[in-house]
Amino acid sequence: LGAKECVTGSCHLVQYEAAGQSVNILVDCGAVYGDDPEIPFTEFPVSPEEIDYLFLTHAHIDHIGRVPDLIDEGFSGEIICSHATKALLLPMLHDAMSFSGRRDKEIHKLEKAIDDLSWGFELHETFSLKQDITFKLFNAGHILGSCFILLTFPKKTEESKEYRVIFSGDLGSTDTPILPDPDSPPECDLLVMESTYGARVHPDRSKRIEQLRELLNKALADKGIVYIPAFALGRTQELLYELDRIDLKIPVFVDSPLALKITEIYAKLSSFWDKEAKELNSKGDHPFDFKGLYSVKSYRDHKKLLEIKGPAIIIAGSGMCTGGRILDHLEQGLQVQRNDIIFVGYQAEGTLGRRLIEGEIPVRAAIHTLSSYSAHADQQMLIDWVKSIPKPPKEIRLVHGEDLARRELTGKLNING
């Protein structure tokens, strides 16, 4: 239904029928960003009242943004996700709903419905649904709480007693700060897999801190401001973790109320961190709290920050520059030659971030892209992930990628058998 030929708006419908009874399962229900070529569907192909389960692979808006619409239209089934995604769900959707034109009363009603319908589940355990369908969640390593999903359907034939489908959701890169690496997938008949970076191999991630350090040293020498558009969920926390490691004497401002709220939740969910982050935290080196880090919560403080002189680092949303406080900062600083803008995440077609990277908008500030900060697996990582399946799937469907990415990854997967 969504993200078939683009990167945003993920939504998949699975229909199963046995003994005259049908089960409708939705996997993700996301919003579309920018000018992604795929026109978002205006109506769900089955009545939301008839959808039994909604699985959420993680809490990014391009995977959950239409959940309020689904409930508005009558959905009352179970929302299934990991425990960490459950904790992140309402803060992310509250922010999205606040910009949707809904009144406070409507938002409060929807939040209560979402909270009542959603359930957090453990990873690596098998749970049962209707009609003897089962599911198991695995760590996807994309952001905190992200998972890929194995759905197993009864299939009483001579060839097999079951049919297994995996939805990858968004797969993370290996060696991502804070997060454990993605799990290897089990055997399946059908694999529905993301392909965001199916045409690209990331630079060596071990060198990215040095790349960031070099750019920040330049800003320090130029006395300029470094603007980093960053997603509130995932990327901001990753940046704070590495800025703490770099330990430069430059003030760092997080100018995003949502990112600050999400960072507080990340801190409370330390049991889901990777080994390195846990060890640092146990030694008293909290990755999201260091000298020179400042939180900008109120709009008044945001307006004051617009007047700051460098050197300084400002992290603000939205990550694709489609809205949020980053727009005020860019308006203020794009035409100042000593300033820098660092993009550390995917920029969808038609977004301001993509247009800046491609040079469509003339600016005096320097534009940089650190693709090694992507929270998505690159081409080789995706291939290796598929190759780690004990037995190759009978079918692979690539989604969540632009045309070039899907075509190139298809070719590579065919070459690798």
Regions found by a protein language model. Name each.
Residues 28, 58-59, 89, 142, ...:
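Divalent metal-coordination and catalytic microenvironments
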Residues 3-4, 29-32, 84, 143, ...:
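Active-site metal-binding loops of divalent metal-dependent hydrolases
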Residues 4-6, 13-77, 81-116, 173-181, ...:
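Pre-active-site segment of Zn-dependent metallo-hydrolases
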Residues 29-30, 52, 162-168, 172-174, ...:
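Acidic/glycine-enriched edge-of-secondary-structure segments
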Residues 90-146, 271-309:
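Metallo-beta-lactamase
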Residues 1-49, 120-180, 302-313, 325, ...:
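Core dinuclear metal-dependent hydrolase active-site scaffold
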Residues 213-344, 349-352:
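Hard-cation-handling environments
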Residues 174-255, 340-345, 355-416:
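Cap/insert and terminal regions of metallo-dependent hydrolase folds
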